Amino acid sequence: MGKQNSKLRPEVLQDLRENTEFTDHELQEWCKGFLKDCPTGHLTVDEFKKIYANFFPYGDASKFAEHVFRTFDTNGDGTIDFREFIIALSVTSRGKLEQKLKWAFSMYDLDGNGYISRSEMLEIVQAIYKMVSSVMKMPEDESTPEKRTDKIFRQMDTNNDGKLSLEEFIKGAKSDPSIVRLLQCDPSSASQF
């Protein structure tokens, strides 16, 4: 089990260039860092949760990290390889709003049926609250995960069928930047959109 070569092969670099918003140099640097932190070339859910916990030291990020991990792990093998990592990172950090919303939708759609049910939304919102509620003051109409979920559904579920389609999700988020803030649980990032 020798040390993996941290230089990306030309065909891999070509694939990542086509599927991310990163430059060749950035891709090489990210790969070096990824292999330094994950010498096996794969990140497990437990390793991912430890990393995520560093970003949210005042809350419990483990449940939310599991949802993010599941969304990064596009082939469903229980690990994140460099390709999965860098493509998800590209979408979440440099993607256009619509790409970010599609990615968020796939995270919220826990069973992968193409809709977000109220219970799926509540599960994610509860995970977010566990992660940040100790450091974020919520408005009264969002003071509990249930209230926040109700507010999101009131604004997004335009056909009142009790579930959100991708179209409703994207349309709702685009028409009201506060929904993006609700989904991200990061008031400062709403101004980026």
UniProtKB/Swiss-Prot annotation:
Coiled coil: none annotated. One of its GO terms (molecular function) is calcium ion binding. It is a lipid-anchor. GO terms for cellular component: membrane. Keywords: Calcium, Lipoprotein, Membrane, Metal-binding, Myristate, Repeat. SUPFAM superfamilies: EF-hand. Residues 41-58, 60-95, 96-131, 144-179 form the EF-hand domain. Ca(2+) 3 binds at D157, N159, D161, K163, E168. A lipid is attached at G2 (N-myristoyl glycine). InterPro entries: EF-hand-dom_pair (IPR011992), EF_Hand_1_Ca_BS (IPR018247), EF_hand_dom (IPR002048), Recoverin (IPR028846). The keyword Cell cycle does not apply. CDD domains: EFh (cd00051). Its main location: membrane. Ca(2+) 2 binds at D109, D111, N113, Y115, E120. It comes from the Eukaryota. It is found in: Membrane. Ca(2+) 1 binds at D73, N75, D77, T79, E84. Probably binds two or three calcium ions. Belongs to the recoverin family. May be involved in the calcium-dependent regulation of rhodopsin phosphorylation. This is Hippocalcin-like protein 1. It comes from Pongo abelii. The gene is HPCAL1.
